[in-house]
Swiss-Prot record:
Keyword set, alphabetical order: Cell cycle, Cell division, Septation
Coiled coil: none
Protein name: Probable septum site-determining protein MinC
The species this protein was found in: Thermosynechococcus vestitus (strain NIES-2133 / IAM M-273 / BP-1)
Gene this chain is encoded by: minC
Assembly and binders: Interacts with MinD and FtsZ.
Lineage: Bacteria, Bacillati, Cyanobacteriota, Cyanophyceae, Acaryochloridales
Pfam families linked: MinC_C (PF03775)
Length: 266
């Protein structure tokens, strides 16, 4: 018998990658959960949080998502957080702010449909914009429904740079510093010193009023009317700003009731 001829086994050819560029990994920028987005809007970012996940489930997903998105910016930018009907307390807002800070982002404004979240955010010093409730969440009632008819009550001082937007009246127990602003569809009541901007009746309500213990606002607005407080300011005492045919008038609180009664008489 003749020995079987052996066939040499071909070795696989391995091409050298020396000097060639490595193929980069594809970055995952798709949200890990539905409804979690981070969008650039004119020098700011808008972070949208879904409302259908518990915080304990959303929190780790949010952290991973921020890691996958941090290539999108190269400087510290303000962030508006739109959390819809999600209820966030102060500790959760602080967690969120710290997570954003780790990625060179700064939490600046909370956009929410929950009054409790708005109060927590304002107490921590963030600007607040309260949204109207979706129609399905508004309880049916006789006549036109008012989605956010309840006033927003805040027991805090509004520092410079803070903005409060609300679709009803706003009550502040504390001062409103210069550089802060309140925009309300209803009345504005400041149980303290008003030095910032106050815009009552922002949706056209000329019957709205601005009331404060000390009127030293940089700007007053009622509906589309505009006024400034006297310079130099008068001695501090409670005053009321209200709209008339001649524009915005300011009256001492102890006489305003009498003035209002006369103007409202038939």
């Amino acid at each position: 018998m003749s020995e079987a001829e052996s066939t040499p086994v071909e070795e696989p050819v391995v091409e050298s990658t020396e000097g060639s560029e490595a193929i980069p990994e594809v970055e995952q920028s798709t949200p890990l959960v539905s409804g979690l987005t981070l969008e650039h809007c004119g020098g700011r970012y808008r972070l949208t949080l879904p409302s259908d996940l518990d915080w304990i489930d959303l929190w780790p997903q949010l952290q991973l998502y921020l890691v996958g998105q941090e290539h999108l910016w190269s400087e510290t930018l303000p962030v508006d957080c739109a959390c819809g009907q999600r209820l966030l307390d102060q500790s959760q807002l602080q967690q969120l702010a710290e997570a954003l800070s780790e990625h060179q982002l700064r939490l600046d404004r909370i956009i929410t449909g929950r009054r409790q979240t708005a109060i927590a955010a304002a107490t921590l010093g963030y600007s607040v914009q309260q949204e109207e409730l979706p129609p399905l969440l508004v309880k049916e009632a006789d006549g036109p429904s008012q989605a956010t008819a309840n006033p927003l009550y805040l027991k805090t001082t509004l520092r410079s740079g803070i903005e409060i937007h609300h679709d009803a009246s706003v009550i502040i127990v504390g001062d409103v510093n210069a550089g802060a602003s309140i925009i309300a569809a209803g009345d504005i009541i400041v149980w303290g010193r008003l030095r910032g901007v106050a815009h009552a009746g922002a949706k056209g309500n000329l019957g709205a009023r601005i009331m404060t213990l000390e009127m030293a606002a940089t700007q007053l607005r009622i509906a589309d009317l505009l006024a400034r407080t006297p310079d130099p300011p008068r001695p501090p005492y409670p005053e009321v700003a209200y709209a008339t045919d001649q524009g915005i008038q300011i009256a001492p609180a102890y006489t305003w009731g009498r003035v209002f009664a006369v103007s409202a008489a038939p």
